[in-house]
């Protein structure tokens, strides 16, 4: 076991000695800047080769990091720490009003009077009565310039 540690220590010393000899030969004072520059140049050359060979790869490599952080400020961007969004429940969004017998849907005056009059007619005659009532009462005398009538579907 001791021989293993001695062997590893010997290799470590050997690597340091090789670095010093290389530094002395290149006269770069041991900062290894030349090897870093060589590595960067080699990476740039490989990158340029990829760009020339495959346009799709070039587009992917040159694309900015996605998604941009400014799009999601809740993740800790400009507004600070992330906040959890409250999830909405379909059951609590709208509360139904209590059923009321006297409450009728909003409608124009003509339809309100038709429905009141139709309550007094037998069920089998209601369709005919409804049409006749509208023909008789939907006149320009009763509703001058269309005041009181709905202007479009769903208004009343």
UniProtKB/Swiss-Prot annotation:
The keyword Glycoprotein applies. Glycans are attached at residue 137. Keywords: Developmental protein, Differentiation, Glycoprotein, Spermatogenesis. Coiled coil: none annotated. InterPro entries: Soti. Belongs to the male-specific scotti family. Post-meiotically transcribed gene that has a role in late spermiogenesis; required for actin cone progression during spermatid individualization. This is Male-specific protein scotti. It comes from Drosophila erecta (Fruit fly).
């Amino acid at each position: 076991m001791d021989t293993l540690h001695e062997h590893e220590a010997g290799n470590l010393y050997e690597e340091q000695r090789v670095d010093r000899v290389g530094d002395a030969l290149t006269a770069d004072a041991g900062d290894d800047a030349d090897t870093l520059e060589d590595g960067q140049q080699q990476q740039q050359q490989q990158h340029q080769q990829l760009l020339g060979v495959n346009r799709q790869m070039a587009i992917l490599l040159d694309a900015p990091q996605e998604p941009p952080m400014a799009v999601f400020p809740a993740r800790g961007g400009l507004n600070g720490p992330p906040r959890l969004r409250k999830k909405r429940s379909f059951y609590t969004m709208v509360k139904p009003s209590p059923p009321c017998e006297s409450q009728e849907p909003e409608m124009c005056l003509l339809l309100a009077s038709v429905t009141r009059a139709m309550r007094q007619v037998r069920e089998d005659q209601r369709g005919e009565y409804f049409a006749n009532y509208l023909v008789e009462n939907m006149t320009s005398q009763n509703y001058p310039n269309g005041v009181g009538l709905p202007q479009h579907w769903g208004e009343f």
